[in-house]
Amino acid sequence: MLDLKLLQKNPEVVAKALAMRHSDIDIATFTTLDTRRRALLTEVESLKSERNKASAEVAKAKRAGEDASALIERLGGVSERIKALDLEAEAVKSEQNDWMLTIPNIPHESVPEGRDENDNVEVLRWGTPRAFSFTPREHWDIGVALGGLDFERAGKLAGSRFTVYWKWAARLERALANYFLDTHISANGYTEVLPPFMVNRKTMTGTGQLPKFEEDLFRLESWDYFLIPTAEVPLTNLHADEILEEGDLPLGYTAQTPCFRSEAGSYGKDTRGLIRQHQFTKVEMVRFAHPERSFDELERMRGHAEALLQNLGLPYRVITLCSGDMGFSATKTYDLEVWLPGQDKYREISSCSNCGDFQARRANIRFRPAGGGKPEFVHTLNGSGLAVGRTLVAVLENYQQEDGSVIVPEVLRPYMGGLERITA
């Protein structure tokens, strides 16, 4: 959520940000509501002053033994009017708040302006894509041929965009997740968390999934709970309605969870394989930072994700998302895209974002300055570290051999019982 004072004092800043995001939201709606709310509050204050004056006149008349019935009647009318205006002001405030919940974050000044993914800016590339002496296959062909990925039985169990992992594939998925977690905990200083995989509506609102993106979520209607689309949701909201100590910042949490997404609007995209699933595993990184240091933390978090890819020997590139392609809650986002030789292109495997105080305002997460003073909103950051299924895809495609086998990257072998090569 944006700062109310910014909307009131500098609506042109917000209007410019919305234009950069190519949003059709009209800032005039807020201005109209805010003007109406202020007018109601002014009228209420005026009537309260009138009520106080009338109360004093009633008391004076009673002390003098005079008839105060007319004054009392007038006082009752003023009180009823105040009550009605208070209710109207609350209704306008609620409508204003609902409107504010639909407004995306303001892009940071370093974010390139653009409409969509075609306007994103490449920052760097790491690693050289392998030159194959044969035509590289796509991961679903490799996984099925080696008996590890079973899309047919998954379809029988749950329908499209689900997968059953067998034997080495199940172990490789687990190995990747454990390697990611161990690295984040031991090398990067994150605290591991195992959060609920279902959350309530308030929690989804805190990180920005609601109210605008409900169609992308799986909802348990009888409880009005939602399956998490990412561990960012529960991890960020761990400190909702709390005041942290400045000396404890930055805080870093990591979690391995299943993620559930309806993939609304993705009809016909990535219909084969593991790239776009209704359920997938991801290891998430979340950080709470001091406002003055949050962009340093973004670079650090991006480095944590990059190091995993480098240790796995997977070529990748880093992209800065343009203003029109960023997520709703982000003020700046880097995407890491891994090279997939079977598809002959880079595909997203991690997204690292600084959300500024946007989520903290929605979830009411603040910190108390070390020197005293009024609590301030923290800055929240989140990043994939990494998407496990997509990393498995990258391992299969980059380490495939002409005989159909797949070499296991060295860093994963301790997690695979020393296995060096996957064969049928």
From Swiss-Prot:
Class of enzymatic activity (EC top level): ligase
**Where does this protein act, in terms of pathway?**
Aminoacyl-tRNA biosynthesis; selenocysteinyl-tRNA(Sec) biosynthesis; L-seryl-tRNA(Sec) from L-serine and tRNA(Sec): step 1/1
Q: According to the UniProt entry, what is the EC number of this protein?
A: 6.1.1.11
**Which keywords does the record carry?**
Aminoacyl-tRNA synthetase, ATP-binding, Cytoplasm, Ligase, Nucleotide-binding, Protein biosynthesis
What InterPro entries does its record include? aa-tRNA-synt_IIb, aa-tRNA-synth_II, aa-tRNA-synth_II/BPL/LPL, Ser-tRNA-ligase_type_1, Ser-tRNA-synth_1_N, SerRS_1_N_sf, SerRS_core, tRNA-bd_arm
Q: Which GO terms describe its biological process?
A: selenocysteine biosynthetic process; seryl-tRNA aminoacylation
The UniProt record gives the binding positions of ATP as: R261, S262, E263, E348, I349, S350, S351
GO cellular component terms given for this protein: cytoplasm
Reaction(s) the record says it catalyses: tRNA(Ser) + L-serine + ATP = L-seryl-tRNA(Ser) + AMP + diphosphate + H(+); tRNA(Sec) + L-serine + ATP = L-seryl-tRNA(Sec) + AMP + diphosphate + H(+)
Task: Show the GO MF annotations.
Answer: ATP binding; serine-tRNA ligase activity
Which residues does the annotation say bind L-serine? T230, A231, E232, E284, S384
Q: What is known of its domains?
A: Consists of two distinct domains, a catalytic core and a N-terminal extension that is involved in tRNA binding.
Please name the HAMAP family in this protein's record.
Ser_tRNA_synth_type1
Similarity-based family = Belongs to the class-II aminoacyl-tRNA synthetase family. Type-1 seryl-tRNA synthetase subfamily.
- Name this polypeptide is given: Serine--tRNA ligase
Species this chain originates from: Nitratidesulfovibrio vulgaris (strain ATCC 29579 / DSM 644 / CCUG 34227 / NCIMB 8303 / VKM B-1760 / Hildenborough) (Desulfovibrio vulgaris)
* Gene name of the record: serS
